[in-house]
């Protein structure tokens, strides 16, 4: 009787092995990600040193996972300075590489800016770009 139950459990467990199929990563550079917004705007008045945070949501609408080769803050990379900081997919970094976004999944990019308006002419316009590179 114990051998019969053991045999059934083994057969039942083996039945699940074919379902553990990994999805092939989509490499076509023409497959675009969808962004909830194409701009992040901070409509905040700073009277003292302060910070504000906004977010951007990125979707993968395709039937397979996509790898984003790089996500980075352009000002920080090319000039070495930016008042912005990023939190990419839960990581407080200004750039990441090889981010896999599963089929139908999404991720958040949070942008925070810290400004000291003292001594500056108002209104203050500070810009930077978040760059997504694929393929």
Where are these predicted regions, by residue range?
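Contiguous beta-strand segments within globular domains
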Residues: 48-56
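Residue-level recognition of well-ordered beta-strand positions that form the cores
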Residues: 57-59, 112, 131-133
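Sec-dependent N-terminal signal peptides
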Residues: 4-14
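Short, conserved beta-strand segments of beta-strand-rich sandwich/propeller modules, principally
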Residues: 53, 108, 127-129
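Surface-exposed binding patches on compact interaction domains or structured appendages
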Residues: 21-41, 51, 61-117
């Amino acid at each position: 009787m114990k051998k019969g139950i053991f045999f059934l459990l083994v057969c039942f467990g083996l039945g699940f092995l074919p379902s553990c199929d990994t999805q092939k990563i989509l490499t076509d550079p023409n497959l675009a990600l969808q962004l909830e917004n194409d701009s992040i705007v901070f409509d905040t008045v700073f009277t003292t040193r302060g910070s504000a945070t906004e977010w951007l949501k990125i979707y993968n609408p395709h039937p397979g996972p996509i790898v984003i080769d790089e996500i980075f803050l352009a000002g920080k990379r090319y000039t070495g300075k930016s008042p912005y900081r990023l939190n990419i997919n839960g990581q407080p970094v200004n750039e990441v590489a090889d981010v896999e976004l599963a089929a139908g999944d999404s991720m958040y990019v949070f942008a925070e800016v810290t400004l000291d308006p003292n001594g500056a002419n108002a209104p203050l316009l500070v810009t930077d770009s978040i760059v997504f590179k694929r393929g």
